[in-house]
């Protein structure tokens, strides 16, 4: 959520930033009009309360002097009714303002390129060279079924489209990837490992910006009023919701693996085969809490943490800056890492790393103190995929496939695969 003072002090800047995202800047005028009404109501209410205090003193004085106080008692009742009415009006305006403010996205950093879609994202780095095959490479969805690593048909029978059973060495590879990523982040990158709740309440979803605007993208357990998480970013960021982080704690770095659940509303017909776009998938997440002056350097570091996984696995990738028309709701700046997939003959997103500045912290009331005597300030929050496990799985299967139908296991994963160096079709 944005600071109301930005609307008051820099309305033109806020309008231009909102317009860059393709949203209607008139919302700024709506907020300012409501803010003016609110301030007038507060002023009028304060005057009434001051008058009520004075009338209360007059009543007490008249009673002490045994004088008739009916007129001032009547005024007191009228003032009480008027104050209740003003408070009700103020509450209504506050709700309207909050309802609008919570749907306005974060302000985009000045160095984010302008554009309308992912076609306008800007490549800033490329690592590795896509492999030239001496044979016709297969898509991962064909490879995993031939090697009995996955079963899409039975998953469709049990759950519907966009689900998968990972079987045999497919399940082992998925587990190995998660263990490898978590181990890398905790032992080399300085993150604290967390196991997170995968059902969360509405306040939690509000804190990170999924609610109220993106409810259609979520799965909800209606009876309990809980939501399945779309990413571990949600519970990890809300760890400090409504708390003041004590001096000396920041920077705080969390990592955690979870299942992620997404309805994929609006993605009908896109990536309908394989592991790229599922309703349920595994992901290792990184979340950081930083002092404001440190968050931009933290974004660079967190992105290199994700890149280190791809490089150690030997997977060609590129880094792009998301343009103004493609960046997420809560982010001020986002880097996407895209891995090379031979089946697409293109790069596909495998990680998003974002600086959300104080946007989520204001929604979730996450503050910190620089020292014991200091006034609490809003922290900056960052999040990044480290990495999307299913897409990493797909990238390994496609990039490490062999002409005889086997898949070579990247060297970094061999210890996590029980020493296994190759995946072959099971005998049975």
UniProtKB/Swiss-Prot annotation:
Pathway, per Swiss-Prot/TrEMBL?
Aminoacyl-tRNA biosynthesis; selenocysteinyl-tRNA(Sec) biosynthesis; L-seryl-tRNA(Sec) from L-serine and tRNA(Sec): step 1/1
GO CC annotations, alphabetized = cytoplasm
Q: Which Gene3D superfamilies match?
A: Bira Bifunctional Protein, Domain 2, Serine-tRNA synthetase, tRNA binding domain
Q: For this protein, what is any one GO molecular function term?
A: serine-tRNA ligase activity
- Could you say which EC number(s) this protein's record lists? 6.1.1.11
Q: What is its main location?
A: cytoplasm
Instruction: Fetch the PROSITE patterns from UniProt.
Output: AA_TRNA_LIGASE_II
Alphabetized, the UniProt keywords read: Aminoacyl-tRNA synthetase, ATP-binding, Cytoplasm, Ligase, Nucleotide-binding, Protein biosynthesis
Q: Where in the cell is it found?
A: Cytoplasm
Where along the chain is ATP bound?
Answer: 262-264, 349-352
Q: Does the keyword ATP-binding apply?
A: yes
Q: Which domain of life is it from?
A: Bacteria
Domain notes per entry: Consists of two distinct domains, a catalytic core and a N-terminal extension that is involved in tRNA binding.
Give the multimer and partner information. Answer: Homodimer. The tRNA molecule binds across the dimer.
Q: Which PANTHER family match?
A: SERINE--TRNA LIGASE (PTHR43697:SF1), SERYL-TRNA SYNTHETASE (PTHR43697)
The Swiss-Prot or TrEMBL record describes its family as follows: Belongs to the class-II aminoacyl-tRNA synthetase family. Type-1 seryl-tRNA synthetase subfamily.
Q: What is this protein called?
A: Serine--tRNA ligase
Source organism per entry reads Staphylococcus aureus (strain NCTC 8325 / PS 47)
Tell me the gene name. serS
């Amino acid at each position: 959520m944005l600071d109301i003072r930005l609307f008051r002090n820099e309305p033109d800047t806020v309008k231009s930033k909102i317009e860059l995202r393709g949203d209607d800047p008139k919302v700024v005028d709506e907020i300012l009009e409501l803010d003016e009404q609110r301030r007038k109501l507060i002023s009028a209410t304060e005057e009434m309360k001051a008058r009520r205090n004075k009338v209360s003193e007059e009543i007490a004085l008249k009673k002490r002097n045994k004088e008739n106080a009916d007129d001032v008692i009547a005024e007191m009742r009228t003032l009480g009714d008027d104050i209740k009415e003003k408070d009700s009006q103020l509450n209504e305006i506050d709700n309207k303002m909050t309802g609008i403010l919570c749907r306005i996205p974060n302000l985009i950093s000045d160095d984010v390129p302008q554009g309308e879609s992912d076609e306008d994202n800007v490549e800033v780095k490329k690592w590795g060279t896509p492999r030239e095959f001496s044979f016709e490479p297969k898509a991962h969805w064909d490879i995993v079924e031939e090697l009995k690593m996955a079963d899409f048909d039975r998953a469709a029978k049990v759950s519907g489209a966009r689900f998968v059973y990972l079987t045999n060495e497919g399940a082992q590879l998925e587990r190995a990837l998660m263990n490898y990523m978590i181990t890398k982040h905790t032992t080399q990158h300085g993150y604290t490992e967390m196991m997170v709740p995968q059902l969360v309440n509405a306040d939690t979803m509000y804190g990170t910006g999924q609610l109220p605007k993106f409810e259609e993208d979520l799965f909800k357990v209606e009876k309990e009023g809980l939501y399945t998480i779309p990413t571990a970013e949600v519970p990890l960021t809300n760890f400090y919701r409504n708390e003041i982080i004590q001096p000396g704690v920041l920077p705080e770095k969390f990592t955690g693996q979870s299942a992620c659940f997404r309805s994929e509303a609006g993605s009908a017909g896109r990536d309908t085969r394989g592991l790229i776009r599922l309703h349920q998938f595994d992901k290792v997440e990184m979340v950081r809490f930083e002092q404001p002056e440190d968050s931009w350097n933290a974004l660079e570091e967190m992105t290199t943490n994700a890149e280190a996984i791809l490089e150690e696995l030997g997977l060609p990738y590129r880094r792009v800056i998301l343009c103004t028309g493609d960046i997420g709701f809560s982010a001020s700046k986002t880097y996407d890492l895209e891995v090379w997939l031979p089946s697409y003959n293109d790069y596909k997103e495998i990680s998003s790393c974002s600086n959300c500045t104080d946007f989520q912290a204001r929604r979730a009331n996450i503050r910190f103190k620089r020292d014991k005597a200091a006034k609490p300030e809003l922290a900056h929050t960052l999040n990044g995929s480290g990495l999307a496990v299913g897409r990493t799985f797909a990238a390994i299967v496609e990039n490490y496939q062999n002409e005889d139908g086997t898949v070579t296991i990247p060297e970094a994963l061999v210890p996590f695969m029980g020493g296994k160096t190759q995946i072959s079709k099971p005998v049975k």
